[in-house]
Amino acid sequence: MNHYETVFILNPVLSETQVKETVSKFEDYLTSKGATMVSKEDWGLKKMAYEIQNKKSGFYHLFEFTVPGEVLIGFETEFRRDERVMRFLTVSLDKHAISWAERRRAKLKATKA
């Protein structure tokens, strides 16, 4: 099983319910294919550096998960088919990136407490 991180941007005109529904759809897809969710973060509505689909902002979300590599093809196809997704990027994490992500999560947890 490989370790991956996906960041995706949802259309800013969506309601809070639609955003939660969309995030849940992708999370359910991963878990149904045997993925283990390591971390899930909602970064909220953020202004983008440049316009995408004539929009200046979007709802950012991050998933960190472990899954067999062949599942990613179907996962990314789901992103491409969903009109609510403006952009997405999936990267494979090496051991250094995994340790950095763990430190970042610990730091976020400490600031929230």
UniProtKB/Swiss-Prot annotation:
The keyword rRNA-binding applies. GO terms for cellular component: cytoplasm; ribonucleoprotein complex; ribosome. Keywords: Ribonucleoprotein, Ribosomal protein, RNA-binding, rRNA-binding. Binds together with bS18 to 16S ribosomal RNA. NCBIfam families: S6. It comes from the Bacteria. PANTHER family: MITOCHONDRIAL 28S RIBOSOMAL PROTEIN S6, SMALL RIBOSOMAL SUBUNIT PROTEIN BS6M. The keyword Zinc does not apply. It holds the Pfam family Ribosomal_S6. InterPro entries: Ribosomal_bS6 (IPR000529), Ribosomal_bS6_sf (IPR035980), Ribosomal_S6_plastid/chlpt (IPR020814), Transl_elong_EF1B/ribsomal_bS6 (IPR014717). SUPFAM superfamilies: Ribosomal protein S6. GO terms for biological process: translation. GO terms for molecular function: small ribosomal subunit rRNA binding; structural constituent of ribosome. Gene3D superfamilies: 3.30.70.60. It comes from Flavobacterium psychrophilum (strain ATCC 49511 / DSM 21280 / CIP 103535 / JIP02/86). This is Small ribosomal subunit protein bS6. Belongs to the bacterial ribosomal protein bS6 family.
